[in-house]
Amino acid sequence: AVADSYGMIASDAIIANGKGHPRAAGTFPRIMGKYVREEGALSLLEALRKCSHAPAERLQLPDKGRIGIGADADLVIFDAEKIADKATYTEPALPPVGIEFVFVGGRKALVGQRIVDGTAGVLMR
């Protein structure tokens, strides 16, 4: 199913008080690590499209899911050889490995596994 051409990849999971589902911290690293690198079920470009551009287009969010002039500059810089999910049912907030930087709205929000700006971005409804 993950390789279906019409499919998109998203998650609505959250972590609250250290409790939740491991997909809250691991959905996208799992796609890149397991389904792209390990199993080859998706190319890296197709996985990126399914995780970013396709959902943004479906939700009619023209400034999301792409890199370009006027876009929101939400970026995740990761090492494709190392990215992997680590969250489990007993430790759902464990951060993934292989993510170097996260930029939200052009602001550096995460370096390695350390949040450096927890106020980057805006709430979307």
Mark where each language-model region is.
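His/Asp/Glu-enriched, well-ordered alpha-helical/loop segment
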Residues: 1-80
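C-terminal cap of metal-dependent C-N hydrolases
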Residues: 1-6, 11-12, 76-122
